[in-house]
């Protein structure tokens, strides 16, 4: 026997069922769509959230809150992300963007959070620092400069 002579075992391969091709196929007449109605039609179906005319959940629940247009928006970066830089580097928002740590600089700048550990001695320039972030930067021999 050669590779080109290989065939599946007898009866192992079945033809796929073609819908709507006569009752003998097992999927004729209604083609698996049940009786007539909206869901039996071409393009039939209801939009997400539609509950058959009953007041939908998203309209039964009250609106809540608002967006404060004066809110401060920072890029929040955990301190362990700064281990990517070499010792003695001055870490700025522009450098973080160039290296791909952040995608874009938010309107209020960078905030350094203290999650994780810092093994490098860096000078970090940012708009805000948490207390734990300042402690960890200084413990590693670096400086935290508030812009």
From Swiss-Prot:
InterPro entries: Ribosomal_uL15, Ribosomal_uL15/eL18, Ribosomal_uL15/eL18_sf, Ribosomal_uL15_bac-type, Ribosomal_uL15_CS. Keywords: Ribonucleoprotein, Ribosomal protein, RNA-binding, rRNA-binding. Residues 23-35, 42-52 have a biased composition (Gly residues). GO terms for biological process: translation. Residues 1-14 have a biased composition (Basic and acidic residues). Residues 1-54 are annotated as: Disordered. One of its GO terms (cellular component) is cytosolic large ribosomal subunit. Binds to the 23S rRNA. Belongs to the universal ribosomal protein uL15 family. Part of the 50S ribosomal subunit. This is Large ribosomal subunit protein uL15.
């Amino acid at each position: 026997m050669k590779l080109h002579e290989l065939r599946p075992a007898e009866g192992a391969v079945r033809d796929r069922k073609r819908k709507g091709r006569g009752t003998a196929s097992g999927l004729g007449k209604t083609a698996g769509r049940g009786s007539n109605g909206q869901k039996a039609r071409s393009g039939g179906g209801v939009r997400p959230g539609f509950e058959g005319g009953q007041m939908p959940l998203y309209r039964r629940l009250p609106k809540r809150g608002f967006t404060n247009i004066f809110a401060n928006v920072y890029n929040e970066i955990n301190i362990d992300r700064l281990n990517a830089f070499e010792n003695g580097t001055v870490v700025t928002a522009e450098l973080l963007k160039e290296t791909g740590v952040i995608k874009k600089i938010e309107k209020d700048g960078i905030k350094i959070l203290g999650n994780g550990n810092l093994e490098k001695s860096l000078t970090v320039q940012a708009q805000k620092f948490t207390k734990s972030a300042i402690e960890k930067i200084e413990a590693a021999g670096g400086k935290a400069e508030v812009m």
